[in-house]
């Protein structure tokens, strides 16, 4: 039997990259999927691909920084069925160092934290009643930078946001365990997604720096995140909560 049969999974950031790959992976394991993304067409494409494969998916546009919009979409999805899996995958990245133009750095700080950290909070809070009712599973997308700041140029706001996602994951796991809700995170390394396509093309030396520090010697693909995401959303991880599964080719071990 598919690992996620009978589950209704909500995936934010489903319009591209890691979120899209996970949405497809969840559907292939039997879950009904609601694909959410600020890019309405991206979310629609993910849902169309799932439905074309014989799965069941719906899609909606969502700006995760809008708390009221998150609550409204949760109410709408409640009519589809109780949500038992929430994958918080919406995220952005900027690469201004702290010593760059002060106004640009401040805007990065506001924008990145609004999406990566506050967005995770907003969506989780909106779906929490349903997740408590179903004794559901929350999977947050963290990062290598949930633990460290990359040696390659990166915004400190991104590092702070992903540290925050890990802290939020652990705090919720401690609080919601009594309700039967499990909360975990995934820590991707350098995964080939649209978010970093420009950096990979224009700064090959940054990619090489990552590879030299990575035992497996390659960058990751969005599909590399799917297995861990299914594991954390399924009964295979029934006694796992408050942890982060690193999917970084071994970068964080050396």
Predicted regions, residues:
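Alpha-helical segment proximal to the catalytic Tyr-Lys
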Residues: 129, 174-178, 238
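Short, small/polar-rich loop/turn modules that mediate ligand/substrate recognition or access, typified
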Residues: 135, 177, 182, 240-242
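Conserved mid-core segment of classical short-chain dehydrogenase/reductases
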Residues: 93-110, 151-157, 197, 201-202
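Catalytic loop of short-chain dehydrogenase/reductase
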Residues: 139-164, 169-178, 191
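Canonical Rossmann dinucleotide-binding motif of NAD(H)/NADP(H)-dependent dehydrogenases/reductases
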Residues: 2-34
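The beta1-alpha1 cofactor-binding region of Rossmann-like NAD(H)/NADP(H)-dependent oxidoreductases
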Residues: 40-41, 61-72, 224
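Short C-terminal tail/terminal secondary-structure segment
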Residues: 229-230, 241-254
């Amino acid at each position: 039997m598919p690992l996620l049969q009978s589950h209704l999974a909500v995936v934010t950031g489903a319009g591209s990259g890691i979120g899209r790959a996970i949405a497809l992976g969840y559907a292939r394991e039997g879950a009904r999927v609601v694909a959410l993304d600020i890019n309405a067409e991206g979310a629609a494409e993910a849902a169309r691909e799932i439905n074309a494969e014989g799965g069941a998916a719906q899609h909606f546009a969502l700006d995760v920084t809008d708390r009221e919009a998150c609550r409204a979409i949760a109410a709408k999805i409640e009519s589809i069925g109780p949500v038992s899996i929430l994958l918080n995958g919406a995220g952005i990245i900027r690469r201004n160092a702290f010593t760059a133009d002060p106004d640009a750095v401040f805007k990065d700080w506001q924008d990145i934290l609004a999406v990566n950290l506050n967005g995770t909070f907003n969506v989780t809070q909106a779906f929490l009643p349903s997740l408590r009712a179903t004794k559901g599973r929350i999977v947050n997308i963290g990062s290598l930078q949930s633990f460290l700041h990359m040696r390659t140029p990166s915004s400190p706001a991104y590092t702070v946001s992903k540290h925050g996602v890990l802290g939020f994951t652990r705090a919720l796991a401690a609080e919601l365990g009594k309700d039967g809700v499990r909360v975990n995170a995934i820590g991707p390394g350098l995964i080939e997604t649209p978010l970093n396509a420009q950096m990979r093309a224009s700064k090959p030396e940054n990619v090489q720096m990552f590879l030299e520090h990575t035992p497996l010697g390659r960058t990751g693909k969005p599909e590399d995140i799917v297995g861990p995401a299914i594991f954390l959303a399924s009964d295979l991880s029934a006694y796992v909560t408050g942890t982060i599964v690193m999917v970084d080719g071994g970068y964080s071990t050396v």
